[in-house]
Amino acid sequence: LSDSELITELEKLGTSSHLEGWQVISVNELRKAPSKVHQLPILDPQDPALLLFTSGSTGMPKGVILTHHNILSMTAGTVAMNHFTQQEVTLNWMPLDHVGAIVFLGIMAVDLACHQIHVPMELVLRQPLQWLELIQKHQVSISWSPNFAFSLINQQAEELKHASYNLSSMKFLVNAGEQVSV
């Protein structure tokens, strides 16, 4: 499922990666088509569900195929290990082409049937304290961030001296997505 502008490139990717049965459908075409045209496929747990790309930090970005089993195992394990419930509120501000954003804070939240909030990354990059304000306003309990966001918040030290945030709703904050700097 993709934007119509990317269809040709994604079809080439499927062919070059030898992905059998690879089908790319434009969101616009899906909206126009009668529902009976697009039958839901019968899926095997080992069928590809997502193709995500590495950052390329060690060379060219590489495509990583995640199966339905990979994704659902990760979300079920995370929920069980952390005792997450339907009462959670997740907040994501990272791009959905990152496994943490799409699987951890997207699909897991759907599995939980909990509230999820997604805001553009640029919002937090331009105004880092917006992240804290959103946590407070929506009583967020789960979020994640790479290291650099904590540095951006630290750079707001003067403003933080005059601010007050109630972040007591937070139960789980993951620091991931880049090397830990010391």
Predicted features by range, described:
Residues 72-89, 96-141, 155-161:
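Conserved AMP-binding/adenylation subdomain of ANL enzymes
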Residues 4-25, 121-182:
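Conserved adenylate-forming
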Residues 51-53, 63-65, 90-92, 117-118, ...:
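Structured core elements
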Residues 24-25, 32-53, 60, 83-89:
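Conserved pre-ATP/AMP-binding loop-to-beta segment of ANL
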Residues 2-4, 47, 68, 146-147:
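Helix N-cap/beta->alpha junction signal
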Residues 49-73:
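Conserved AMP-binding A3 loop
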Residues 1, 23-27, 62-65, 115-122:
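Short beta-strand->loop structural element characteristic of the AMP-binding/adenylate-forming
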Residues 46-47, 86-88, 114, 171, ...:
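Surface-exposed loop/turn positions
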